[in-house]
């Protein structure tokens, strides 16, 4: 159901980390050197989390390391050697076969069409609009669509309940919905704004909110999850909802004809039910 969301992106899995010549990636070498793999069941996840940290940061403090691996669980409780392995990366020369091929990779990605996507096959539909206007047009011709952004909640319906989602509209390519605006009296957060971006922004104004967001899932979840998704699913375990309720936040909803403003305390009706009608979106 979610495979088309990979369009235009580079997918790197743990098997890709070893070079074609069989040379281990610096992250893998560190894990071996510090005996950071116990039973091995969780090792691929830790390796990929540290690989992401390795590629996106220039130095690795213990706080950053712990945050980077927070989405992984080692039942053997072998965290000390894992953290030691990660710290040792500060002493390595930051290069790998991905860096050597980066120009080629970027060139290939640029050749991929960036136009909106529409897939209809075997009674299943998938749309990926680029603008709000395109989204509105798709909604008009598709009854009861399932909106998808980060998919951190929706994906459980597929992986746990084995549900088949027939009519998906992927929102993550709509840049108009990815923003943070601050005025004198309030902060506006776009529906598509990743939690990780908001987490970094909000520290200056509400450090306690930042602290809570750091406990929200893991870096992987916060990289794709959105506050609007947290609100729209009306989950009783939505991490941001108690804070948004206490701040008397407002939700802006696009209806068929206009945009309406709803106090968040009035937005929720009951368990996993909101005032959003079919075709309306935040």
Stretches with model-predicted labels:
Residues 10-13, 26-32, 36-37, 47-58, ...:
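C-terminal structural segment of proteins
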Residues 17-19:
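Extended heptad-repeat alpha-helical coiled-coils characteristic
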């Amino acid at each position: 159901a979610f495979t088309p969301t990979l369009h235009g992106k580079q997918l790197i899995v743990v098997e890709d980390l070893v070079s074609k010549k069989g040379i281990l990636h610096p992250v893998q070498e560190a894990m071996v050197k510090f005996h950071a793999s116990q039973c091995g069941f969780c090792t691929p996840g830790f390796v990929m989390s540290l690989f992401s940290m390795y590629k996106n940061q220039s130095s690795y403090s213990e706080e950053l390391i712990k945050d980077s691996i927070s989405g992984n669980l080692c039942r053997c409780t072998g965290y000390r050697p894992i953290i030691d392995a990660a710290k040792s990366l500060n002493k390595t020369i930051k290069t790998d076969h991905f860096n050597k091929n980066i120009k080629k990779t970027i060139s290939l990605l640029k050749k991929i069409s960036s136009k909106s996507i529409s897939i209809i096959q075997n009674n299943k539909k998938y749309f990926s609009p680029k603008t709000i206007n395109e989204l509105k047009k798709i909604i008009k011709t598709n009854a009861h669509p399932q909106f998808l952004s980060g998919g951190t909640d929706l994906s459980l319906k597929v992986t746990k309940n084995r549900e088949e989602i027939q009519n998906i509209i992927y929102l993550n390519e709509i840049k108009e919905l990815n923003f943070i605006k601050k005025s004198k009296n309030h902060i506006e957060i776009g529906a598509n704004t990743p939690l990780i971006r908001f987490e970094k922004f909000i520290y200056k104004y509400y450090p306690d909110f930042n602290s809570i967001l750091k406990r929200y899932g893991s870096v992987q979840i916060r990289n794709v999850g959105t506050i609007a998704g947290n609100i729209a699913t009306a989950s009783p375990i939505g991490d941001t909802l108690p804070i948004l309720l206490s701040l008397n936040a407002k939700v802006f909803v696009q209806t068929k004809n206009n945009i309406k403003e709803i106090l968040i305390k009035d937005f929720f009706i009951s368990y996993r039910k909101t005032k959003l009608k079919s075709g309306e979106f935040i």
